[in-house]
């Protein structure tokens, strides 16, 4: 089974927006991560203002759908490119296949690789200029199949 979830990118007000969505849809955040929690990347420095911004946030709005988002960091979100689709596959092989097909004729912005947050993950923009985040997480699959584990696939912004 594949699952597609909306991913929203904000110009610094993600936390405010998601608190609003939480008031509308109810529920609790299953993940809130800030840029200050990322491993430091060589040649990249976070400003004090960026450290507290949202790297990733997740709000389940139904049994099947998780509203996800982040603040912009390395690119500027504009209306139109501030929404991406996050697809979680049920195997690493399917993640590779989906990523290859979606990025064909488009832009492979982050190749598929194992991430520090646990997902096998990549980002691309397809030939129709749609932003995609492709991931596979074995623990997330167990959760979807009824396991007691409370681990969620986490995606980062495009």
PLM features: residue spans?
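Vicinal oxygen chelate
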Residues: 2, 30, 55-58, 69-71, ...
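Core segments of cupin and vicinal oxygen chelate
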Residues: 8-63
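Extended amphipathic alpha-helical segments enriched in small hydrophobics
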Residues: 65-67
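Acidic/polar active-site rim loop that often engages polyanionic ligands
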Residues: 81
């Amino acid at each position: 089974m594949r699952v597609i979830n909306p991913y929203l990118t904000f110009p610094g007000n993600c936390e405010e927006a998601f608190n609003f969505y939480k008031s509308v849809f109810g529920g609790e955040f299953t993940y809130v991560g800030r840029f200050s929690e990322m491993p430091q990347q060589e040649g990249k420095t976070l400003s004090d203002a960026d450290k507290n911004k949202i790297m990733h946030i997740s709000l389940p709005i139904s049994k099947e759908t998780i509203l996800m988002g982040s603040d912009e960091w390395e690119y500027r979100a504009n209306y139109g490119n501030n929404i991406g689709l996050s697809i979680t596959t049920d195997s690493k092989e399917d993640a590779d296949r989906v990523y290859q097909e979606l990025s064909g004729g488009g832009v492979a912005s982050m190749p598929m690789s194992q991430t520090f947050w646990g997902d096998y993950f990549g980002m691309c923009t397809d030939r129709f200029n749609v932003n995609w985040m492709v991931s596979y997480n074995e623990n997330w699959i167990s959760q979807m199949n009824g396991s007691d584990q409370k681990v969620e696939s986490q995606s980062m912004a495009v």
